Design a protein with these regions (language model features):
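Sec-dependent bacterial lipoprotein signal peptides
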Residues: 1-20
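Residues within mature, well-folded domains
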Residues: 22-169
Length: 169
């Protein structure tokens, strides 16, 4: 059974590497201020979510969780052209998450999490995002935002991605 789990994990890892390579190619084909909404949709497909942005812009969310390490926010300006393409799972964005912040604001900032875990006895809900804190997949970490029952931030945590560690036998 343990061998089968490792085989599946290796396959999932290979798929992540291939998909992340696809993202690099897609991003290289787009240019801010030139590429259109149609260009973005042609390369990335339908967005996970669409958020209203400033001055009539729209922000498209392209989620790579749970297996990937990125979430992209692509801003389409009121003129229909791509104004920005950002990978949002970064320590700089994590530092912007503050106690009391509503879940919706965190969700707009970081995109859909890889996992949501309620802890009823603690009256907490943990939202987890997998990200890379360096150039290698061995640098993978998990950023956790802990919410109360009112879906307001209590605290944040960062830990090594448990998927990197083999299970105990």
């Amino acid at each position: 059974m343990d061998r089968w789990v490792w085989v599946c994990a290796a396959g999932l890892f290979a798929a992540v590497v291939v998909l992340s390579g696809c993202d690099v190619q897609r991003i290289a084909e787009l240019e801010e201020g030139v590429s259109t909404e149609a260009d973005v949709r042609e390369r990335f497909g339908a967005p996970e979510a669409v958020w209203e942005g400033p001055e009539g812009s729209q922000i498209y969310e392209y989620n790579r969780q749970p297996a990937g390490h990125q979430n992209y926010m692509i801003t389409i300006g009121a003129d229909g052209k791509m104004a920005a393409l950002r990978q949002v799972l970064t320590p700089q964005n994590f530092a912007r998450v503050e106690p009391g912040m509503p879940m919706e604001a965190v969700r707009r900032m970081l995109g859909k999490p890889m996992k949501v875990t309620p802890y009823d006895l603690k009256a907490e809900i943990h939202y987890d995002w997998r990200y890379l804190d360096g150039p290698n997949t061995s640098d993978a970490k998990v950023f956790t935002v802990v919410f109360n029952r009112d879906l307001r931030v209590l605290r944040t945590e960062t830990a090594r991605d448990p998927a990197l560690d083999p299970p105990n036998r």
